[in-house]
Amino acid sequence: RDVDFGHRVDWYDILLNKSNLGQSHYLAVSGGGENLTFRASANYKKKDGLDIASSRKEYGVRMGFTAKTLEGLLEIQGNLSTRVINEEYVDYGVFQQAVKLNPTHPLMDEKDPSKYSTLYGFDTYNPVGWLKDKEDGGDRQFSLADFKVKLNILPTLNTELSLARQSQEYFKRIYVNSNHKESIDNMRSGRGTLQSFRSEE
């Protein structure tokens, strides 16, 4: 039988986000005249995870135009879009820890209630502190631009020049503060890593 440490903690329940609502906003405008038209749109999405750590925010902007000159002899079209995604990840191993962890362990440090308790023992840790004392996320950006120039030589004859470019960037970030069990076990004041990846076409 396990030791009774005098507390009553529902570890699994604390890991669940009870208000994991999402929201989405969208705005679009367009206009122009006979020789010029334009359109632009922007959107924002936010969704919290079912747990207390994960979330996702997304911002997007699109713009485009079409212009005609020289009485329709020359047409120019352009489009530009970019999307930024901010994500916070979760270590799902904390749920396994929550199921098997002694519920009489304290959630907060008994000597310093502003900190999460540090638990010792084989494969034993505070699953709430494991998430709260660590930042594990990623930032992505997708960009796409294309332009087309069309020359209408004759009513049934034209020539076009098209240019396009797309890029992706990803920044993976991890920050473990000094109160995290990883830092305490390894006698470190914390840990931070930042990795970046980029591709273009």
Regions found by a protein language model. Name each.
Residues 1-52, 90-93, 130-133, 150-152:
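Residues embedded in well-ordered regular secondary structure
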Residues 1-8, 50-54, 60-144, 160-162, ...:
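Surface-exposed loop/interface segments of Gram-negative outer-membrane beta-barrel transport/assembly proteins
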Residues 25, 34-38, 72-78, 155-161:
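Outer-envelope beta-barrel architecture signal
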